[in-house]
């Protein structure tokens, strides 16, 4: 309990709150730069908005990563609104937390390059697994209901890109899982390349 209280106090320090706000704002802006992928429907777009989330989680802990991810979603909703009845934004937050929290938990116990790489690999794996589960049982069914779309029509959007996508399970395995694997891997790669320099700035100048 005492350790948890100290960690909460540190997280809520003025410096960390400022950094989380800055990283959340940067992450929200990065959501504007989206790249479509050829193997998934158009509402799956690749971006690098989770790089600040992952950096913040490494620097300040897993809870900070979740807060930064929430800030980016709030900024996106305020500036752009939603075209997915909030489902896309919820999915984005879940993805970010699934990647950043396991990575930060592993890195926190032994802060080394090897630990960071192991953490990011674990984070990507969790991101893929959580993405498969939530899309199968929560996100895609909710999306279909929100837009009064038969699930077959949603699956058909995947079939148009890949004839092997002929069921919800195939949609998740051949579109959702590769998308999360690609995004998580690219975000982790960029984070690995820039984290050391950014962390020095956080410690020495902010």
State the predicted function of each range.
Residues 1-206:
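Loop-helix junctions at membrane interfaces
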């Amino acid at each position: 309990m005492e350790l948890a209280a100290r960690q909460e106090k540190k997280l809520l320090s003025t410096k960390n709150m400022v950094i989380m706000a800055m990283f959340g704002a940067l992450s929200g802006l990065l959501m504007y730069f989206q790249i479509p992928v050829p193997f998934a429907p158009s509402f799956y777009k690749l971006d690098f908005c989770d790089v600040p989330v992952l950096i913040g989680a490494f620097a300040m802990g897993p809870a900070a990563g979740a807060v930064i991810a929430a800030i980016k979603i709030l900024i996106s909703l305020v500036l752009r609104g939603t075209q997915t009845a909030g489902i896309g934004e919820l999915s984005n937050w879940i993805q970010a937390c699934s990647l950043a929290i396991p990575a930060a938990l592993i890195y926190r116990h032994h802060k080394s390059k090897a630990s960071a790489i192991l953490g990011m690999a674990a984070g990507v794996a969790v991101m893929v697994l959580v993405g498969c589960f939530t899309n199968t049982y929560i996100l895609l069914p909710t999306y279909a209901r929100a837009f009064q779309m038969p699930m077959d029509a949603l699956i058909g959007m995947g079939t148009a890109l890949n004839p092997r996508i002929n069921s919800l399970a195939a949609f998740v395995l051949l579109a959702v899982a590769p998308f999360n694997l690609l995004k998580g891997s690219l975000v982790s790669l960029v984070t690995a390349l820039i984290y050391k320099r950014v962390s020095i700035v956080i410690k020495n100048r902010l």
